[in-house]
Amino acid sequence: MAVARTSNTRSTTRTDRSTGTTGSRSVTGRRNAQLHRTVQSINIQRFRAQGRTTFCNQAVHAIASKLGYRGFGGLVANQMVRKMQSPGSGFRQVSAQEAIRMAQSGKLVVAGWYNTTPRAGRPDGRAPGHVAVVTGEFSPGVPGIAQAGRNTFEWGSVRQGFGSKNVSYFVRG
């Protein structure tokens, strides 16, 4: 099976041995090429987990900074989500579909999950949440993200990054 790539899509070409015909099917959806280049420029693998410590917040801060927003410095994921929820933050909460559309147009879109479990010793008194940057549509109706964490990747589905958690989406501007 041959794999053809462009900056926005990945598809496979398969030859049916019984008929000799060739067909293509989409393996992943579409992502914004400029956002993808921004993600590549930060070398997201440098934010991969070290033991039980994860750095999703730092990866999102690095990407956001490259896109002109520097307001996440020093915040953990839960604090980032709370900040984006705050009036006057410059972010607004949107649906998954709107997040996809805004990311495909090149806007900074952050996916976030606020962990409500209490944990002493944390900056916000809660167990770690999670954040990632939406860069397009992974599959129909499913946001594609770049993330650091237990799994660190430049392109994957929101489900790969957050599992079944209740994710909120925030667009800048």
Question: Which functions belong to the PLM regions below?
Answer:
Residues P143, Q147-G173:
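Glycine-rich, aromatic-bearing surface loops/beta-hairpins
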Residues M1-S7:
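Short, compositionally biased, intrinsically disordered N-terminal export/targeting signals
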Residues R10, R14-N78, Y114-T117, R126:
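N-terminal capping segments
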Residues Q45, L67, S89, G112, ...:
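Intrinsically disordered, low-complexity segments enriched in small/polar residues
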Residues R70, R92, N115, G163, ...:
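Compositionally biased, intrinsically disordered low-complexity regions enriched in proline and serine
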Residues G73-F153:
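...with weaker cross-activation on analogous glycine-rich loops/strands in unrelated enzymes
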